[in-house]
Amino acid sequence: MRISKVVTKTGDKGETGLGDGSRVSKDDPRIECIGTLDELNSFVGYVKVAIADDGIITFLEKIQNDLFNMGGSLSMPGTEIETVNKECIDALEKQVDTGNSELPPLKEFVLPGGSETSARLHLARTMARKLERKLVGLHKNNPLPEQWLQYINRLSDVFFVLARKLQRAEGVDEKQWTHE
């Protein structure tokens, strides 16, 4: 589908169109998932502009394309395809394992923040978790490819490890939760 017109006025009464031509309420669980994918994708772009490492930028752009692929597939009910596969999940897991091997073990939860880049990545992590919850809800009545849930779960781990790794690279001490 190509966008040729931005203002269509077809959504002015609380409905939107899907790729198959059907109309649904803008609060439909499928639309919630598509919207949350869009939020996360936009935020990954916001993370990207704070990063100077070309390798990480390329990796984040791959993630953005994966998220767009999932959103496009979601817009065609009943035809959801495996837009992210085992190789995509393996790439995320490799990023987590590599990054985590460079970090000290955690004793407590990490307080989000510390540096601008780290704070953005922690927010992206929470957005990925939110998307995961919405996808699980949709999956209950509308089966989705299982790899989607795995991918989004691993994606939040990627953002967590990248937040820690980049904060450390920026020379900012990591603050951990001190419970009383």
Region roles according to the model:
Residues 1-180:
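Phosphate/pyrophosphate-binding loop motifs in nucleotide- or prenyl diphosphate-using proteins
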